[in-house]
A protein has these predicted regions:
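Beta1/beta-strand and adjacent pyrophosphate-binding region of the FAD-binding site
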Residues: 1-10, 167-172
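Glycine-rich flavin
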Residues: 2-3, 19-26, 31-165, 193, ...
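N-terminal Rossmann-like FAD-binding beta1-loop-alpha1 element of flavoenzymes
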Residues: 5-29, 181-186
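Short hydrophobic core segments
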Residues: 8, 128-137, 255-263
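FAD-site-proximal beta/loop scaffold in flavoenzymes
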Residues: 149-165, 252-327
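Rossmann-like NAD(P)H-binding beta-loop-alpha module
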Residues: 164-197, 204-205
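Structured beta-strand/loop patches that form or line metal/cofactor-binding pockets in enzymes
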Residues: 349-381
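Single conserved hydrophobic/aromatic residue that forms the stacking wall/gate
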Residues: 379-390
Length: 390
């Protein structure tokens, strides 16, 4: 069977590329080994935001009297929260499939194996393609900390499906994923400790905003250990023991559950990538140019596999550029103004350069900061202590 475009991976990059290519008049084959939607739809952006919305609603209900709304007794039902999350995910996955089917994209479920740039096998079938787009995404990175294999730790997948709340939770990693889970579990009454190797949470975000968010969650009971390196892990009857060292010396945290949230890395194994001999970056991602072209003609890479920006909206834009390249349309990828949002409560967001990045790059800049109290609308919702900076 022959196609003009073969796409491996059905996440935001893959399904966007498939739809765009099909609308451009190309015959398209999309191969996905798990559920359509990728990490974002199944175990990332969407399920976490669904849980966070429930937590935010619960938090608002607890403080409703502040707005002259009396709710005698406020409670939550964790199994129902998890069930609602799963329902939302299922509905959106079906929506992706329906859209692809409506655009005559051929969808094959299974593990793809690349034979060469024009040949891909899946199960007993072999497919030929004129163009190959790789959208295999990323996977959770678990650092080789001594004792990690002996600890019953959570990844984000486990945290998304847990129907029982631990009394305490230690989170290794204070990035976006770590902080969103810290927000969720803290809102539901779990004692949370965040251990972060950097000197501030949410690396890459504006440091002042990150510090403000940390201060707010410190008030709410979350404990932060910054500039702290985890040196060992162990399991006891009481829970996981996180041994660490920092400028103050050595110490440990004991928690009923441990969430490993150090980061993600591109998926480069298990689908025959080595048969293409693509040029890779120092960190193992696939090197591409501004048209999403790799070092091999007619082979494109989009999404987390590029290693640039592990965000769904970045992947969508990369997919558009890749398809435009195949169709001969003038387009180029730019990473200058990619928005980033942390869906904690309160949320923080940013786009473009931060003061730190502008200073590092030698860019002359001016900063304008404005308290949210200047906005009458935001003042009505008690957001007066928040901040906007340009």
């Amino acid at each position: 069977m022959k196609y003009q475009v073969i796409i491996i991976g059905g996440g935001p990059a893959g399904y966007t590329a498939a739809e765009a290519a099909a609308k451009g008049g190309l015959s398209v084959l999309l191969i996905e080994k798990n559920s359509l939607g990728g990490v974002c739809l199944n175990e990332g952006c969407i399920p976490t935001k669904t849980l966070l919305y429930s937590a935010k609603t619960y938090d608002s209900a607890k403080h409703a009297s502040k707005y002259a709304v009396n709710i005698p007794e406020v409670s939550f039902d964790l199994p129902k929260i998890i069930a609602r999350k799963s329902k939302v995910v299922r509905k959106l996955v079906l929506g992706v499939k329906a859209k692809l089917t409506a655009n005559n994209v051929t969808i094959v479920s299974g593990e793809a194996q690349i034979i060469d740039k024009n040949t891909v096998r899946c199960g007993e079938e072999t497919y030929e393609g004129e163009n190959l787009i790789l959208c295999t995404g990323s996977e959770t990175f678990i650092p080789p900390i001594p004792g990690v294999d002996a600890v019953n730790y959570w990844t984000h997948r486990d945290a998304l499906d847990s129907k029982e709340l631990p009394a305490s939770l230690a989170i290794v990693g204070g990035g976006v994923i770590g902080m969103e889970f810290a927000s969720f579990f803290n809102s539901l009454g779990v004692q949370v400790t965040v251990v972060e190797m950097m000197d501030e949470i949410l690396g890459g975000m504006d440091k002042e905003l990150s510090a403000l968010l940390r201060a707010e969650y410190t008030k709410r009971g979350i404990k932060f250990l910054l500039s702290t390196r985890v040196v060992g892990l162990s399991q006891t009857e009481e829970g996981a023991v996180v041994s660490y060292e920092n400028a103050e010396g050595n110490g440990s945290v004991i928690a009923e559950k441990l969430l490993m949230s150090v980061g993600r890395r591109p998926v480069t194994k298990g689908f025959g990538l080595e048969n293409l001999n693509l040029e890779q970056t120092e960190r193992g991602a696939i090197r591409v140019n501004e048209k999403m072209q790799t070092s091999v003609p007619d082979v494109y890479v989009c999404g987390d596999l590029t290693g640039f920006s592990l965000l769904a909206h970045t992947a969508v834009r990369e997919a558009e550029v890749a398809v435009h390249s195949i169709l001969g349309k003038e387009d180029a990828m730019s990473y200058r103004a990619i928005p980033g949002v942390v869906y904690t409560n309160p949320e923080i967001a940013g786009v473009g350069e931060t003061e730190e990045s502008a200073s590092t790059k030698g860019i002359n800049y001016q900063v304008i900061k404005l308290p949210m109290a200047y906005s009458c609308l935001l003042y009505t919702s008690d957001a007066a202590d928040d901040l906007i900076g340009v």
